Amino acid sequence: MPNTHKITPQEALLRTIEHREIFHDEMLHIMRGIMTGEWSPVMMAALITGLRVKKETIGEITAAAQVMREFSTKVNVADTSHLVDIVGTGGDGSHTFNISTCAMFVAAAAGARVSKHGGRSVSSKSGSADVMESLGVNINLSPEAIAQCIEQVGVGFMFAPNHHPAMKNVAPVRKELGIKTIFNLLGPLTNPAGAPNILMGVFHPDLVGIQVRALQRLGAEHAVVVYGKDGMDEVSLGATTLVGELKHGEITEYEIHPEDFGMVMASNRALKVETPEQSKTMLQGVLDNAAGAPKDIVILNAGVALYAANVVPTMSAGIDKARVAIESGAARAKLAQLVSMSQQLKGAAK
């Protein structure tokens, strides 16, 4: 095949209009141009809208994620065994409290090491960074300090803008467009600590198969990609969840149901919040072992994360461990440890 990677913005845009794929090397070239600010905001907006209309392919997503990783500020964790990210693409419009943020403390208390990669609210009522800050966690630590948190506490939070400085060129365009774009798919694929394991929630059923295959191409070890049929980008308590799993290089797709794990189904209405403050209150309630749907959905998601992190051999075993982590107070203690350590390391902030 000829060397086609030098593609102009206009050629790339035409390709999306004609519903034709942009090849891997071309996508690398395009993304590098976007990251270095070579592309004008108009062409950037046109291309990412065109990709969305055409529907991004696994190859396009993989190439774009490779470039984002290339330009990112890394967190070097010495031992990545049992290291997992618990993350959603967001944009599911469900306005629930920060389930994955809460689940990370539970998973860490039960033996996983969690490198959580998140940002402020884009489409939800409360982004993971918003709620972490309100809990007292210092979200602006240096990469070295975050690695220390992961190694010593078992959990670290990476505030996305600090690790993807090149994204500043795209941020205003994304904000003004106000639609989901390829960048919603890329954030969860670009963990700065290089977590080899991941529990990823997606906002559309088609993305289960797409994202798990992108993760396979990007070299992930154990990935569990989920979509709740009630529209949630989490393992759902109110519906069947579609799962795409990558393990030992093989992909399997299947469905799970809360009742498979002895859980009582509940509508996600009980999980809705309006403000980061409400999200914080609900999250603290879960860690304080308050019974109800919020606790159950966190147990479900933390349990699946423990399975993704290879701490347990089955999702059921993970769910049992997650329940103990909450009921023993270990998950609550994990939050306190992260708050304390992140504040102590403030001197190491950016």
Curated annotation (Swiss-Prot):
Cofactor: binding details: Binds 2 magnesium ions per monomer.
Keyword Glycosyltransferase belongs to the record: yes
Binding site for Mg(2+) 2: D233, E234
Binding site for anthranilate 1: G88
Binding-site residues for Mg(2+) 1, renumbered to this chain: S100, E234
The protein's annotated pathway: Amino-acid biosynthesis; L-tryptophan biosynthesis; L-tryptophan from chorismate: step 2/5
One Gene Ontology cellular component: cytosol
Cross-referenced Pfam families: Glycos_trans_3N, Glycos_transf_3
Binding site for anthranilate 2: R174
Reactions that this protein is recorded to catalyse: N-(5-phospho-beta-D-ribosyl)anthranilate + diphosphate = 5-phospho-alpha-D-ribose 1-diphosphate + anthranilate
The protein's required cofactors: Mg(2+)
Coiled-coil segments: none
HAMAP family found in the cross-reference section: TrpD (MF_00211)
Family the entry assigns: Belongs to the anthranilate phosphoribosyltransferase family.
Protein name: Anthranilate phosphoribosyltransferase
Source organism of the structure: Albidiferax ferrireducens (strain ATCC BAA-621 / DSM 15236 / T118) (Rhodoferax ferrireducens)
